[in-house]
Swiss-Prot record:
The gene is gltX. One of its GO terms (biological process) is glutamyl-tRNA aminoacylation. GO terms for cellular component: cytosol. It catalyses: tRNA(Glu) + L-glutamate + ATP = L-glutamyl-tRNA(Glu) + AMP + diphosphate. The keyword Transcription regulation does not apply. ATP binds at K240. Keywords: Aminoacyl-tRNA synthetase, ATP-binding, Cytoplasm, Ligase, Metal-binding, Nucleotide-binding, Protein biosynthesis, Zinc. A motif ('HIGH' region) lies at residues 9-19. This is Glutamate--tRNA ligase. Its cofactor is Zn(2+).
Length: 471
């Protein structure tokens, strides 16, 4: 049997981390078994579905590089197929037309709730032989079995049983002729030959209804696996107050897709004590049997740690391709300065996100208008004038511009003036970067370049001279 899974989001909002984890698990399961992964857009909610949400879902899947083998399929383009199946069910007697008014259904609901009963349709039209005109408004309901039970072996949770007496006669076509979500899902899974449905635990109650419809159609029933919810680190359902919940928001915040995927795969699944997984390792090791039944807690600090790890372990050239977007967001012109791959090497240890990296690299490419006030007050004092003059001259004399030779120039200045490296290094750092913090000074000065570094030292000397004149 060829394994076939699907990810079927509703385009009523962005791709959130819970949906992304479900997509990842479905994708990994298919890849592990050499099967196929289908992308299906469940856009039957015409009022809430938007083109922007569809685009956001596709953007998120593409950014995570969860490539699909079929699709994307859109349910709104399959209404003719759904209605044809409903008509067949009406002919076969496995579905029936219901003419009950909203007022009657509301009254029935109130009466049942007053008795402490679970609200459900009472089957009035199922057993009615009353004649109705063809143009009289009605819905179509599925004639759910009235006895027995539905048992399915959840691939994560084990056997789950529902009594058919607990299940309603589900509406499968509305009065406007549009098919409903639960019915469309069934026909799609049947037509697309889905073998394994991996989805959130909030769909468990839909499963017995969908199984009964599949059996009524004499269609094969797929295996089901329901993944637990994701909570915030406070144990409450994950929401915006816990931080970003949109996949693309994590992109915007400077996370690498490898970091988010690695974090999401471990959010409910494990393989021993291993924490870091390449995509290939995920595919090789993933199994539904190792997915936890318990809810997972989202820990932003752990994700940040993973992101920092990947910034420093993936090829700098690759990280630079993702950094480019953030550089553009900051409107930094990188034509005059180090290559972005070199920048990744320079700032990787200091920066935990690519956004942070982009926001802290401007001095490598553009001159700054003023020095950081606190850093200048502390380090650009009259006592720093001589060290800056000497190191400027030694840097000017370098013919082979390299980080090693920059280091020698700084060390030679300290030796000549018989002062500690800090007496030379800190004023020099503020002079060339405008701030009191940077990567190692030799590689920083080298990356900024000889001409620009000397110009900035002269600017700092001018700042010191002006400061002296005001005393």
């Amino acid at each position: 049997m060829k394994i076939k899974t699907r990810f079927a989001p509703s385009p009523t909002g962005y791709l959130h981390v819970g949906g992304a984890r479900t997509a990842l698990y479905s994708w990994l399961f298919a890849r592990h078994h050499g099967g196929e992964f289908v992308l299906r857009i469940e856009d039957t909610d015409l009022e809430r579905s938007t083109p922007e949400a569809i685009e956001a879902i596709m953007d998120g899947m593409n950014w995570l590089n969860l490539e699909w083998d079929e699709g994307p399929y859109f349910q709104t383009k399959r209404f003719e197929r759904y209605n044809a199946v409903i008509d067949e069910m009406l002919e076969a007697g496995t579905a029936y037309k219901c003419y009950c008014s909203k007022e009657r259904l509301e009254q029935l609901r109130e009466e049942q709730m007053a008795k402490g009963e679970k609200p459900r349709y009472d089957g009035r039209c199922r057993h009615s032989h009353e004649h109705h005109d063809d143009d009289e408004p009605c819905v179509v309901r599925f004639a759910n079995p009235q006895d027995g039970s539905v048992i399915f072996d959840d691939q994560i949770r084990g056997p789950i049983e529902f009594s058919n007496q607990e299940l309603d006669d589900l509406i499968i076509r509305r009065t406007d002729g549009s098919p409903t979500y639960n019915f469309c899902v069934v026909v799609d899974d049947w037509d697309m030959e889905i073998t394994h449905v991996i989805r959130g635990e909030d769909h468990i109650n839909n499963t017995p209804r969908q199984i009964n419809i599949l059996k009524a159609l004499n269609a094969p029933v797929p295996m089901y696996a329901h993944v637990s919810m994701i909570n915030g680190d406070d144990g409450k359902k994950l929401s915006k107050r816990h931080g970003a919940v949109s996949v693309m928001q994590y992109r915007d915040d400077g996370y690498l897709p490898e970091a988010l995927l690695n974090y999401l795969v471990r959010l409910g699944w494990s393989s021993g004590d291993q924490e870091i997984f390449t995509r290939e390792e995920m595919i090789k090791l993933f199994s539904l049997g190792a997915v936890s039944k318990s809810a997972s807690a989202f820990n932003t600090d752990k994700l940040l740690w993973l992101n920092h790890h990947y910034i420093n372990t993936l090829a700098p050239e690759y990280v630079a391709t993702h950094l480019q977007w953030h550089i553009e967001q900051e409107n930094i012109d990188t034509r005059n300065g180090p290559q972005l791959a070199e920048l990744v090497k320079l700032l990787g240890e200091r920066c935990k996100t690519l956004k942070e990296m982009a926001q802290s690299c401007r001095y490598f490419y553009e001159d700054f208008s003023e020095f950081d006030a606190d850093a200048a007050k502390k380090h650009l004092r009259p006592v720093a004038r001589q060290p800056l003059e000497v190191v400027r001259d030694k840097l000017s004399a370098i013919t082979d511009w390299s980080a090693e030779n920059v280091h020698h120039a700084i060390q030679a200045t300290a030796d000549e003036l018989e002062v500690g490296m800090g007496k030379v290094g800190m004023p020099l750092r503020v002079a060339v970067t405008g701030a009191g913090q940077s990567p190692a000074l030799d590689v920083t000065v080298h990356a900024i370049g000889k001409t620009r570094s000397i110009e900035r030292i002269n600017k700092a000397l001018g700042f010191i001279a002006e400061r002296e004149s005001q005393q």
